[in-house]
């Protein structure tokens, strides 16, 4: 297990394709600002595409911030995840969290993606171990702190996660279409 994030994207108009992020000491891949003086959503990373990537087996010492993919806290507009897979992470498969201190982020689109077995570790022999009580363990977490953000989840599947397959996390603006969520263990 490494230390920190595998990949932290703070730019604009980037494409990340056919990459794998695994066994990191925090989350696998995150889109968020890199410079603290960027305080407006218009300055935050925007217009990025993450295509056909996989993130798995990410774990952090605090047991609450090891998402597979994250586009949260300080991310701008038009960030898209397409054809990606997130599984066996300590925390959420996808985390699109927003908090009051920084304000609403730009809407995130997640399409044709799968999230499964988050909350469980994938061992070298292909068996699984329960990570314990991680913070999320959801397939797709699409908001936070009752802030309206028009995140859009479409044509995705979520199954076998330790908690919810899809969690709006108090986001009143979240939308989804053609999403299948089954055999998740619940809240």
Question: In which residue ranges do the predicted regions lie?
Answer:
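Extracellular beta-strand/beta-solenoid scaffold signature
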Residues: 2-8, 23-45, 58-74, 88-102, ...
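Short "repeat-start/strand-capping" segments in structured domains, especially the N-termini
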Residues: 12-15, 34-36, 46, 77-78, ...
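Beta-rich extracellular carbohydrate-active architectures
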Residues: 1, 16, 20-22, 26, ...
